[in-house]
């Protein structure tokens, strides 16, 4: 397996939001992704790309400790958020997930009204402000207010797939995170809905740091400032493939002037 990855030397002027430091994630005895170093800048969109099974979603879930919910999953190395170790014993994973929200691959509205989809999480997190204002602001930020302002009492499941995904984004925004993780948020959507999500991402990065996993390389080009390319290779004695970070750089450099041949091969469609 390729043991090294390529990225620009750390820029002291970059405000690092999340720092992944020599992270290896295992399921039982199997190492799913190994030795990942990556500094995610604040206020930008970072895309994770790579073929299936390369560990990009595993790393994404580690950023807000969603992997804690998978039996047998363990982390070696460190993941720092604002300089603090997310996996330190005193850290509450529930609070981590509030500050680092997640939007999943399949839209998953709560079985509640559109209004309550937004208000529910804020309420249980102790929000004491104007709930109507919070609901409207969150729906506006997710670019769905105009489409649902007259049916807030209707079920979230009555919306189209693309609208449901934007509702889920609004639900995430409502608990006021600092980072939003998106795991293939457009994979189940049609091109028009995908475009709306991408336009929403461009607006959201004004207020949030965003990390998105995508198989759609053109989507990575359209929405991201930085791109991390992951790959996977078989290891002697292992039944599966181990993922690793090949290269992390400005999106323009990854797609137009990559420093690694594997990156060039992937972004040019030679494998994947």
From Swiss-Prot:
One Gene Ontology MF term: ATP hydrolysis activity
Entry-linked InterPro entries: AAA+_ATPase (IPR003593), ABC_transporter-like_ATP-bd (IPR003439), ABC_transporter-like_CS (IPR017871), P-loop_NTPase (IPR027417), PstB-like (IPR005670)
One GO cellular component term: plasma membrane
Key words, A-Z: ATP-binding, Cell inner membrane, Cell membrane, Membrane, Nucleotide-binding, Phosphate transport, Translocase, Transport
PROSITE patterns tied to this protein: ABC_TRANSPORTER_1, ABC_TRANSPORTER_2, PSTB
Catalytic activity: phosphate(out) + ATP + H2O = ADP + 2 phosphate(in) + H(+)
Subunit structure as annotated in this protein's UniProt entry: The complex is composed of two ATP-binding proteins (PstB), two transmembrane proteins (PstC and PstA) and a solute-binding protein (PstS).
Protein name, UniProt field: Phosphate import ATP-binding protein PstB
Organism: Synechococcus sp. (strain CC9311)
Gene: pstB
């Amino acid at each position: 397996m390729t043991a090294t990855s390529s990225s620009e030397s750390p820029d002291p002027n970059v405000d690092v939001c999340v720092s992944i430091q020599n992270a290896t994630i295992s399921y039982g005895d199997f190492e799913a992704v190994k030795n990942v170093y990556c500094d995610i800048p604040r206020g930008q969109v970072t895309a994770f790309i790579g073929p299936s099974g390369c560990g990009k979603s595993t790393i994404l879930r580690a950023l807000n400790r969603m992997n804690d919910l998978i039996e047998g999953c363990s982390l070696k190395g460190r993941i720092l958020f604002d300089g603090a170790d997310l996996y330190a014993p005193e850290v509450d994973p529930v609070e981590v997930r509030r500050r680092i929200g997640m939007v999943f691959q399949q839209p998953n509205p709560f079985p509640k009204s559109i209004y309550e989809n937004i208000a529910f999480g804020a309420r249980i997190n102790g929000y004491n402000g104007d709930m109507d204002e919070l609901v409207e602001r969150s729906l506006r930020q997710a670019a769905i207010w105009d489409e649902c302002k007259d049916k807030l009492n209707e079920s979230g499941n009555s919306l189209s797939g693309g609208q449901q995904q934007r509702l889920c984004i609004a639900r995430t925004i409502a608990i006021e995170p600092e980072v939003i993780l998106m795991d293939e948020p457009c994979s189940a959507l049609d091109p028009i809905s995908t475009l709306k999500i991408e336009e929403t991402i461009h607006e959201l990065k004004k207020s949030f740091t965003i990390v998105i996993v995508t198989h759609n390389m053109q989507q990575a080009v359209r929405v991201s400032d930085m791109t991390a390319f992951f790959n996977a290779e078989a290891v002697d004695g292992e039944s599966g493939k181990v993922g690793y970070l090949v290269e992390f750089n400005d999106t323009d450099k990854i797609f137009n002037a990559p420093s690694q041949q594997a990156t060039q091969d992937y972004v040019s469609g030679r494998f994947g």
